[in-house]
């Protein structure tokens, strides 16, 4: 069992693997090197079994499960924007919950790692030895709508899996009324035209989640979009009322 924590990762195992009631004990701990900035906010696993972790300052780390080696890369834009954004959000809000990256990531079967920064969603490709940001390897970065300036609060979700299916990655964007937003995971179809109101041609669909009430002016979600087939569902985390 692996858990991500603020400054690293922790491995746990059963005292007696043959006993289903055996207690868990910590067996190893990995601390991030000083050059990897920020706090960890996400953890997942690539198809080869390596852990992948993300920090709020835009670092992505691939970590061997025995903690013997790691590979790190910065997301596009992190070197110029992440530290300032994190400092500004902490000053404005009094906490570090609205970092340049503030959600976890999802991984597909080909090594694609999908993660959102404050105004872009990225596909970074794990080759088995390194992270690639190269379009030739299938990597991309695409902007999404971000009227609040706080970015997406949803960990990306995959939609479409069959060899002949359209394949998307789905987020809730950063507008005041959150839009469920689909990106083409793979190559954008040649005849695809950029949608009205979409800041990127990679966006395959978007629509506001009004929750059945078109008069609502603020709807936010902090959960991953729930996907079933090509259907998607979200919740509203805006409180129905506030104390005086």
Could you tell me what each predicted segment is?
Residues 1, 33-48, 82-107, 150-158, ...:
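Repeated scaffold domains used in trafficking and secretory/extracellular systems
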Residues 49, 57, 67, 79, ...:
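Intrinsic-disorder/low-complexity loop/linker signature
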Residues 8, 16-19, 45-51, 58, ...:
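Elongated scaffolding segments in large macromolecular assemblies
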Residues 5-17, 57-66, 118-127, 176-185, ...:
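Structural motif
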Residues 1-5, 48-55, 61, 111-116, ...:
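Short beta-strand elements that form the blades of beta-propeller/WD-repeat-like
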Residues 22-35, 69-96, 138-146, 204-215:
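A short beta-strand motif characteristic of beta-propeller blades
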Residues 2-13, 25-64, 72-73, 99-106, ...:
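Mobile, glycine-rich extracellular loop/lid and propeptide segments
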